From Swiss-Prot:
Monoterpene synthase that catalyzes the specific reduction of the 1(2)-double bond of (-)-isopiperitenone to produce (+)-cis-isopulegone. Does not catalyze the reverse reaction. Unable to reduce (+)-pulegone, (+)-cis-isopulegone, (-)-menthone or the 1,2-double bond of (-)-carvone. Able to utilize NADH with 20% the efficiency of NADPH. Pathway: Secondary metabolite biosynthesis; terpenoid biosynthesis. The lineage of its organism: Eukaryota, Viridiplantae, Streptophyta, Embryophyta, Tracheophyta. Belongs to the short-chain dehydrogenases/reductases (SDR) family. Optimum pH is 5.5. Coiled coil: none annotated. This is (-)-isopiperitenone reductase. It catalyses: (2R,5R)-isopulegone + NADP(+) = (6R)-isopiperitenone + NADPH + H(+). It comes from Mentha piperita (Peppermint). It is found in: Cytoplasm. Keywords: Cytoplasm, NADP, Oxidoreductase. Substrate binds at residue 182. Its EC number is 1.3.1.82. NADP(+) binds at residues 10-33.
Amino acid sequence: MAEVQRYALVTGANKGIGFEICRQLAEKGIIVILTSRNEKRGLEARQKLLKELNVSENRLVFHQLDVTDLASVAAVAVFIKSKFGKLDILVNNAGVSGVEMVGDVSVFNEYIEADFKALQALEAGAKEEPPFKPKANGEMIEKFEGAKDCVVTNYYGPKRLTQALIPLLQLSPSPRIVNVSSSFGSLLLLWNEWAKGVLGDEDRLTEERVDEVVEVFLKDIKEGKLEESQWPPHFAAERVSKAALNAYTKIAAKKYPSFRINAICPGYAKTDITFHAGPLSVAEAAQVPVKLALLPDGGPSGCFFPRDKALALY
């Protein structure tokens, strides 16, 4: 009996981890819909990948997609329905950091490494995140506009795209949704006790309550009240948006029990966002979302997996 053809959509796929996710899924025989906000870059990425994989053009298609634009989201759903009739795998990979850099950009990676160490300390029982002062002569600035873009791209975007594609995923015998998140979405790094309480209360968790946390955060940063309201001192929008995405992952998994829906941290990789620092290549980072995208039936759902735990699943 012939194997049923599977179709996957990957967001933010014209470069970096998203591009490598497309490559690895295509190598598994899956027809991949490579999407990106910028049409020119997306088409160029498709041609590059087709050449590198040496496969027929119908194995990899491109469609413009801006996850922050409702019309763009609706258009890609119509495209998939008309061309393929269903969707098997959705990888919500597109994301932004929400910060502006001034001076030496290596300060960005100092903060990332400090946050990883802080999370390890908190997981080991530390009462609070240790203070950190970077050595590099640079500054990381978080403004309302960047924070809003971060929240819309990292949380609202994946949520709205997922909701738009649910009817097509329901036509798959083994629907999979992978939300590319971050360990920085850990509630241990969220600081604000009210937000931690809301997002950590799984029995009462709803989309409306998650949205409320996000909107209160945006209101506070707009009014210059981040410190007063006890939000994180840096990567605030990144932490809040990824914590919200992790919470939505649990909600969606509970609502659609036949799906396998999980969030993952791919690890600290050399991408444009990290100014190409980090120990992992984008190919290594992509292994994690691909692993979750190909999760066997009966696998876990509604979970967040750090890189090491995801790789050990099967």
